[in-house]
């Protein structure tokens, strides 16, 4: 799969909710996103970055690679930190971005199970960045 580079109109659009997470096409898309992300040495990759307007993203953190289907951040900490971020759709660009240190997120995993997770630090930042992609927000709009 090819990673779309900005500007591309799909990167500015809110994605559609996945109706059936266990659908064969959805499962294949997740597998393809994982492979593309790993080849690109990314920490995360969202479906719109590969041309699919669906609420799916894949995260690589702490030796684990997992998909989030229809993720929703249910709470943000008031405490925020600014750190440099990059994005596979913006090769070579790194910008200081302010984000919440901790979040709570709800999503469906690849097996169709609903997950509620608390994240902080780098994992929280990666999740916020990827979920932004699903909402049509690219990181340069956060600076």
What residues fall within each predicted segment?
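Positively charged
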Residues: 1-143
